Amino acid sequence: VTDYARHIIMQGPTYGLQTDLTNKDLCGFVSNPMEHGEASKLALYGVADYSWNIANYNPLDNWERGLVDLTPEAHEAYRTFAMHSCDTETGYRRIESWETKSFRIDNFTDAEFNALQSEFVRVKNAPAQMEANCKNALLMKELRPWLTEFGKLGERGLKTMSLIKEYKAGNDQAFWEGYVNNRMSKEDVAAYEKHKSGTMV
């Protein structure tokens, strides 16, 4: 969940586990929550499922079920946050934002643009949806600093999408002014670096 990357609260699937182990290979399996006990439950859900039925363990299926079981009233918003909060920046975990396709500013289709814009809307709205619907107050207390920065990420992403339109339309002045206004201040950067998500969007 945090472990060796305290600025990222990893909420992605528990993957990379061998599924051909038997009782001849091991006699037990130990795992523990990190300092954010409630936020650790999604990973522990994966570990529990794996240790119960190793041969049939499916990390993505397990993760999807875990989101629903842990936050049934807010699982879509939690899913949006969790999917974009997986990468450690160390190269150990690399699967993040796997449903999001990015593109170069000079090479994209309308469908790709609309899909990415819609994802940034979901990112922007996820924190408020979690606040309104998630009944686990302790989980919200743990996630709130990251959710705050996640919402800001969505806002910056949507502004960036608007900049792409200005660029394509040849509105150089509007593009430049929008770019300058969308830049993060030193304080913004410091807050984001402390509670980071969306590192691979």
Predicted ranges, named:
Residues 1-201:
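Substrate-binding groove of N-acetylhexosamine-processing glycoside hydrolases
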